[in-house]
């Protein structure tokens, strides 16, 4: 449908759209929750075969660490898709981790830009590695580490399935 819409407006260079609304399988209008606009942007970018998707935020979370704890932290200049996804799942809140997949699958770089510091140039997320050993530090509160050890009476796949069954029962990840 997007290609049909664009074909009707060939002379238009810029399209503005919302990012939080969608339709579900029942054709009902739904709200995508926080970060849904990031996902919409990369899905639209993939559909259009964009050269790059820019995500703007007013958050200063594009730093190497939390500015509430470290004075004047440096900006993260470049991350691979895998690094960005791991940081997001571990508490780095500069963007929605679900926006990575459409960009990664279509090899479309994502540029995170901070509206509070537009001159900084932002953070480029792509398939490329920068060679730096440490990119950023992030943390989440109330995380628990659980170590499982099998007594070998169950086959490994049965053991693991019982663990995940327990997580599912309590809606935990």
Residue ranges and their predicted role:
Residues 1-173:
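C-terminal catalytic "cap/lid" subdomain
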């Amino acid at each position: 449908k997007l290609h049909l819409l664009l074909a009707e407006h060939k002379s238009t260079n810029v399209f503005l759209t919302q990012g939080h609304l969608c339709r579900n399988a029942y054709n009902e209008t739904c709200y995508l929750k926080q970060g849904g606009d990031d996902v919409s942007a990369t899905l639209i970018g993939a559909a259009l075969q964009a050269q790059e998707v820019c995500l703007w935020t007013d958050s200063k979370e594009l730093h190497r660490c939390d500015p509430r704890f470290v004075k004047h932290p440096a900006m993260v200049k470049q991350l691979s898709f895998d690094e960005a996804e791991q940081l997001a799942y571990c508490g780095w809140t500069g963007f929605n981790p679900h926006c990575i997949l459409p960009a990664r699958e279509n090899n479309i770089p994502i540029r995170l830009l901070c509206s509070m510091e537009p001159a900084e140039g932002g953070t480029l997320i792509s398939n490329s590695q920068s060679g730096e050993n440490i990119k950023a530090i992030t943390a989440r509160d109330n995380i628990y580490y659980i170590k499982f050890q099998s007594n070998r009476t169950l086959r490994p796949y049965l053991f693991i399935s019982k663990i995940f069954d327990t997580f599912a029962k309590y809606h935990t990840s």
